[in-house]
């Protein structure tokens, strides 16, 4: 603390932590149609089995009508990254194909740094600010890869053998499986942000407040194209509030406005952009001293349109509520 009245408070912290893979990360085996979601536990790889139909073009090359795949076709074996196969489909250039091998997932580690400042100024303005920076090792999320039903995954297309070319033909025939797998990236991942909160009584018992947060995620996608980071956090959030617990006898109110910028949502179910949202919430309180109770009536997303916070989930609409709290 600093200042004559010790009202300037500074804080700083350094922490280390880790995040273990969840049960789903390790043991899920789910066919989602366009791709299969495979957990990374060693015991799970043989547990997941699916039989895929081979195209007529593939059968004409002499391959069976079906192909059995297991979780081992997704992990610890050469596979193609999904973005590179997409480019190959557009250009026909085999040099666009990128070969990778997915390792089993392991715990993620983080080093977290934070500094902050808090004060109440002589004019009654309360200030709370903080800045943070996180460094991740073995950042844990998912990756999407492709394996052909026949042929081999390889980069030497000039050999006398035809297995590599047959693998390319499998991709061209649509005889390939997309796997979404749980793994770690070896690339550097960091996140940083800041927060600022202000509050002040502006007139009699009216309380005005505002909060802003900035969140930023740094990951070079070009160095690990198939990795899906899934930060899923808006870069900017803003909240403003106005309230008075003593508007007049036994009555109070509070109004909040919340806004966030658009952000990318990435998950095993769906990916997409979540649009920016502005939400207005309001509440009035009425105290009933005779029965030691408080009646609250309010609305969330008042006058607003339905909005989403997660791709693939239902939209959030308006909510009206009322409650009576009794304090005997």
Predicted segments with their positions:
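Transmembrane beta-barrel strand/turn architecture of Gram-negative outer membrane proteins
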Residues: 1-25, 29, 112-132, 211
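Conserved C-terminal beta-signal and adjacent last beta-strands/turns
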Residues: 8-11, 15, 51-57, 199-214, ...
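Membrane-embedded beta-barrel scaffold of Gram-negative outer-membrane proteins
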Residues: 11, 43-178
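Surface-exposed loop and edge beta-strand positions of immunoglobulin-like domains
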Residues: 15, 106-108, 118, 132, ...
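Short acidic-glycine motifs
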Residues: 19-20, 25-41, 137-147, 220, ...
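Short sequence motifs at beta-strands and strand-loop junctions characteristic
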Residues: 97, 104-109, 177, 186-190, ...
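Short, P/G- and charge-enriched loop/turn segments at secondary-structure junctions
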Residues: 101-103, 183, 270
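Gram-negative outer-membrane beta-barrel transporters
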Residues: 120, 126-267, 323-325
